[in-house]
A protein has these predicted regions:
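Hydrophobic alpha-helical scaffolding
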Residues: 60, 182, 236, 246-254, ...
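Contiguous, structured surface segment used for ligand recognition
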Residues: 9-93, 448, 463-497
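Flexible, acidic glycine-rich loops studded with aromatic residues
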Residues: 326-331, 336-511
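Generic recognition of stable, solvent-exposed alpha-helical segments in well-folded globular domains
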Residues: 109-112, 184-191, 252-259, 306-314, ...
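Sec-dependent N-terminal signal peptides
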Residues: 2-9
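Flexible loop/turn segments at secondary-structure boundaries
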Residues: 6, 104-106, 132-138, 210-216, ...
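Feature activates predominantly on carbohydrate-active enzymes
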Residues: 21, 41-273, 314, 318, ...
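Active-site neighborhood of glycoside hydrolase catalytic domains
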Residues: 218-222, 234-344, 349-372
Length: 511
């Protein structure tokens, strides 16, 4: 039984795995530290008495997390609750994806994200740097990627609908509105890496290929498949541009991709894992492209879908030669041919009947692990912050479509991403992430970013750190009432625990 049932009154989030409230408080602020090699990685032991706080830690991360818990034990009057806690993570991967490709976040905002990750004992910042709608990775070798890919026009058809209301209010005639240029510098990246390292957070950079490449192709149109009709040197804002594929049959395109990865590794020194994307690539473009068909004939590839596997293996081998392991979305292992030892997989499409009916690859995480792959769970049904908090969320309007559905705090907390795992798969499940996608947003600033992420990110943090079994949402909800006040006192925009229209909103007052 985890500590939430012992320490509910202390409102610790994420809940410690073991602990007991011993009663009373102390004003003694003395803290002593000692290393304890018997504790699990990232673990700590905390004892608060009248003599102050005693902290034993396994490593630097454990020492940091002990201080985080100690801070949460403090009352507004400065006194600290007496308690004994032993704590360590259930999973080594506790991540948060930030999509800066669609909507840019300056480095100062990323520092804020990293601070909030420490507060919730999260340790992987997944930095989604390239997209159809924007290129944010600096590059000296391919300057047009920044010159043309870092800005876009709001000019696609149908933009006078409700989704564009707030942008029109802010900038007037959006048909003349240019977003950007926005791109990080090498110095920005170095600062983010240093800030993350000091907080024991891994930074995972992502260059998403071969799909989601409109910004790439806008810079270098000849590297896209033939006959797609893309306008040269222009990026616009349109969701789901699945025909924006890099031409896998073009040797120059493939070499340019590898060159970008090389430059990325220079900017992320010491990185041992790089995200290569691989999701939502539209095979229709390749099937119609003479160069791609020629590649298939040359390599003996019978199925156009297997063309992506050929490309994926080439990228993986290139990174492996430099001592870097690849990680990618679920589609990269849809077909056989990618060795499990070479890659980590993020199966992101939740296996519901609608997705299966479309013929999309949507396995359960355990099904991918059963094939021998290391897995990070990434459910679009329970962990995507692009979806609204509730069906009638006025602040996060969405088109009336079956594809758009609310993801409540309770949905996220009750998600058992390790369900179906067998003892033989032990060690292959690395953890899970929350995903701040911004493709379903017309306008986006840091308030929007935080409002969409909280309080749901708190649920991801707890299920990845504590992985309580069984889940007790009532207990989590009770602790979150206090924790939400903490976050708001820090200036973090948060949606209500029980938004209007949710099942709980009718029976309780939302903080």
């Amino acid at each position: 039984m985890i500590a939430a049932y012992f320490l509910a009154a202390l409102a610790l989030v994420p809940a410690p795995r073991k602990g007991v409230e011993t009663g009373g408080t102390t004003t003694n602020a003395a803290v002593t530290f000692r290393f304890d090699g018997s504790l699990p990685k990232e673990g700590y032991r905390l004892k608060v008495t009248d003599a102050g706080a005693e902290i034993a830690y396994a490593d630097g991360a454990g020492k940091l997390y002990a201080r985080v818990t100690l801070d949460q034990l403090k009352n507004p009057d400065g006194a600290t609750a007496k308690a004994e806690i032993e704590d360590y993570p259930a999973y080594p991967w506790r991540g948060w994806l930030i999509d800066v490709g669609r909507h840019f976040l300056p480095k100062e905002n990323i520092f804020d994200v990293l601070d909030l990750m420490v507060l919730h004992k999260m340790n992987v910042l997944h930095w989604h740097l390239t997209e159809d709608e924007g290129w944010r990775l600096p590059t000296a070798r391919h300057p047009d990627l920044v010159r043309y890919g870092s800005q876009r026009r709001y000019d696609e058809p149908g933009m006078d609908g409700g989704r564009w209301r707030r942008v029109r209010e802010w900038v007037g005639d959006t048909r003349r509105y240019t977003y950007g240029p926005h791109c990080y510098s090498r110095e920005d990246i170095a600062e983010v890496l240093a800030y993350a390292k000091a907080r024991h957070i891994r930074v995972l950079p992502e260059f998403d290929v071969p799909g989601h490449s409109r910004a790439f192709i806008a810079a270098y149109p000849h590297l896209g498949c033939e006959g797609l009709g893309f306008e040269t040197n222009r990026v616009c804002r349109a969701k789901g541009m699945k025909s924006a594929q890099i031409c896998i049959g073009n040797d120059e395109a493939v070499q340019t991709v590898l060159s970008v990865f090389d430059e990325m590794l220079e900017m992320f020194p010491g990185v041992d894992l790089v995200h290569i994307g691989g999701d939502e690539a539209d095979t229709k473009a390749w099937a119609q492209c003479p160069k791609c068909r020629a590649r298939m004939k040359k390599e003996g590839i019978a199925d156009v879908r297997a063309l992506q596997t050929w490309f994926t293996r080439k990228v993986i081998a290139h990174l492996a030669a430099k001592g870097v392991r690849a990680i990618g979305w679920g589609e990269i292992v849809q077909d056989p041919g990618v060795d499990p030892k070479d890659v980590v997989v993020m199966p992101w499409l939740h296996p519901d009947p609608g997705q299966k009916a479309l013929g999309r690859y949507c396995p359960y995480p355990w099904e991918v692990a059963e094939r021998g792959y290391d897995v990070v769970a990434a459910s679009h049904r329970f962990e995507y912050w692009g979806w609204p908090h509730c069906r009638d969320d006025e602040y996060q309007p969405h088109p009336k479509s079956a594809y758009y559905f609310p993801v409540s705090l309770e949905d996220t907390y009750l998600y058992e991403f390790d369900r179906g795992w067998k003892p033989s798969m032990k060690g292959r499940i690395l953890g899970t992430e929350g995903y701040s996608w911004s493709d379903n947003r017309t306008a986006w600033n840091f308030f929007d970013f935080m409002y969409s992420a909280f309080p749901r990110t708190c649920a991801v943090a707890e299920i990845a750190w504590s992985n309580p079994k069984p889940r007790c949402y009532a207990d989590f909800h009770k602790r979150m009432q206090t924790h939400l006040k903490r976050l708001r006192a820090m200036g973090v925009p948060c949606a209500p625990l029980d938004p209007p229209g949710s099942a709980r909103a009718d029976s309780r007052q939302s903080p």
